[in-house]
Amino acid sequence: MKICLIDETGAGDGALSVLAARWGLEQDDDNPMALALTTEHLELRKRDEPKLGGIFVDFVGGAMAHRRKFGGGRGEAVAKAVGIKGDYLPDVVDATAGLGRDAFVLASVGCRVRMLERNPVVAALLDDGLARGYADAEIGGWLQERLQLIHASSLTALTDITPRPQVVYLDPMFPHKQKSALVKKEMRVFQSLVGPDLDADGLLAPARQLATKRVVVKRPDYAPPLADVATPNAVVTKGHRFDIYAGTPA
């Protein structure tokens, strides 16, 4: 995959070249999207809209730390949707990991989560965030046990993941309505890189075959059900719903 690669570390240790080789990234100086290695982290930038800033994965500080410490925990909609109850903490495959937010919430509550991400740039961002998270004194211990990254396409990986999870979680990119053009800055940068998941409908059937208990699909409230398969079961929040489908018992 071609992207503009920028090294701002000043270390001169070739770390960016190693990273590019690992994730199959090619230097493209004219690409509007850039992956920059700073002294703090790896971040994604939209070069033609610099005011949007850089996107990076941070499990240790910022919004994620606030959500972990002061968020709803088990009361969060995603936790309710996957079926967390009492001692039941399902094993989850997050088949559309994105920036790892929902996966992190589930891991922080106690679930073991395997994240799938097919886009190499997004996978590199997740891997960078995980490395910093694993090294953190406060959360590193449980994070290493509960949150892992698999760089693969969900369309193929969902058929051969072992052991089978109890829950498969899907949050495919959905084209935003025109009127929400001022979508969060971060989402604009992210969508410029990955675009909508046009093949997302193909995920529902293999996800239901893989999950032993249920499949949870996060949708904007205005979006039709995934693959046009309606379900009466959903956890509804302001702006979103979590559609729930039966899996295939082991």
Swiss-Prot record:
Q: What is its EC number?
A: 2.1.1.242
The compartments listed are:
Cytoplasm
Question: Origin organism of this chain?
Answer: Klebsiella pneumoniae subsp. pneumoniae (strain ATCC 700721 / MGH 78578)
* GO MF, any single term: rRNA (guanine-N2-)-methyltransferase activity
Q: What is the lineage of its organism?
A: Bacteria, Pseudomonadati, Pseudomonadota, Gammaproteobacteria, Enterobacterales
Keywords associated with the record: Cytoplasm, Methyltransferase, rRNA processing, S-adenosyl-L-methionine, Transferase
In terms of superkingdom, the source organism counts as Bacteria
What NCBIfam families does the annotation carry? Answer: PRK10742.1
> What is the annotated role of this protein in its UniProt record?
Specifically methylates the guanosine in position 1516 of 16S rRNA.
Query: Would you identify the family this protein belongs to, as annotated?
Result: Belongs to the methyltransferase superfamily. RsmJ family.
State any GO CC term. cytoplasm
Q: Describe the reaction catalysed, as an equation.
A: guanosine(1516) in 16S rRNA + S-adenosyl-L-methionine = N(2)-methylguanosine(1516) in 16S rRNA + S-adenosyl-L-homocysteine + H(+)
Q: Which residues form a coiled coil?
A: none
What is the protein name stated in its UniProt record?
Ribosomal RNA small subunit methyltransferase J
Q: Where does S-adenosyl-L-methionine bind?
A: R101, D102, E117, R118, S153, S154, D171
Pfam families named in the record: SAM_MT
